Amino acid sequence: MASATIKVTQTRSTIGILEKHKATMRGLGLRRIGHTVELEDTPAVRGMVNKVNYLVRVEGE
C-alpha cells in the first residue's frame, strides 16, 4: 500500500523572508512561484509546511 502524499505549491516569493524559512523552502524542494512538489505526508513534512504556510498552498489533505 502506497503512503499518503500531499502536493505543495509555492505561491509567494522568498525575497525578504527569514533565512530559516528560505532553508525550509529549499528543504521542501520548492524553487520558484508556481512550482509544485509531491511529498510524503509525514509529521516532519507537515511541520515544514506549517512553518512556511504563508508562502505555500497544500492540496490532498
From Swiss-Prot:
Secretion signal span: none
Claim: Ribonucleoprotein is one of the keywords in the record: yes
InterPro entries in the cross-refs: Ribo_uL30_ferredoxin-like_sf, Ribosomal_uL30_bac-type, Ribosomal_uL30_CS, Ribosomal_uL30_ferredoxin-like
GO MF term list: structural constituent of ribosome
Pfam families xref list: Ribosomal_L30 (PF00327)
GO BP, sorted A to Z: translation
Alphabetic keyword roster: Ribonucleoprotein, Ribosomal protein
A cellular-component GO term for this protein: cytosolic large ribosomal subunit
Ligase recorded as keyword: no
Quaternary assembly: Part of the 50S ribosomal subunit.
Cited PANTHER family: LARGE RIBOSOMAL SUBUNIT PROTEIN UL30M, MITOCHONDRIAL RIBOSOMAL PROTEIN L30
Family note: Belongs to the universal ribosomal protein uL30 family.
HAMAP family on file: Ribosomal_uL30_B
Protein name per its UniProtKB record: Large ribosomal subunit protein uL30
Organism for this UniProt entry: Chromohalobacter salexigens (strain ATCC BAA-138 / DSM 3043 / CIP 106854 / NCIMB 13768 / 1H11)
Gene from which this protein is expressed: rpmD
